[in-house]
Amino acid sequence: IKGSPNLYAGGGGGGASNSGGAGQAGGGNGGVGSGVGGAATVNTGSGGGGGGGNWSAQFGAGGNGGSGVVIIRMLTSDYSGVTTGSPTVTTDGSYTVLEYTSSGSYTV
């Protein structure tokens, strides 16, 4: 979207009794034993890690999911420049990219 690899909306790692797997694309790591799953990377919309699955203890809680992100890409010639909030605005070749990580709007 922005000319360099960016990963969004990855799943969280699963919980297990011995070792939890790592989440992909910004997802949180899985919990180990009765441990808690790791939180996902912020502003990626990714899932949190799964809780631990220890058979002899309390199950650990799953990690928090990543906060959301909205990305709008358009030809720079179509970009009106009318925004609210605080989007990150970048130009990539002949495209303009708006990235919102909090409330805002874009008017065509």
What are the language-model segments listed below?
Residues I1-V108:
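Low-complexity, glycine/proline-biased repetitive segments and flexible coils/loops
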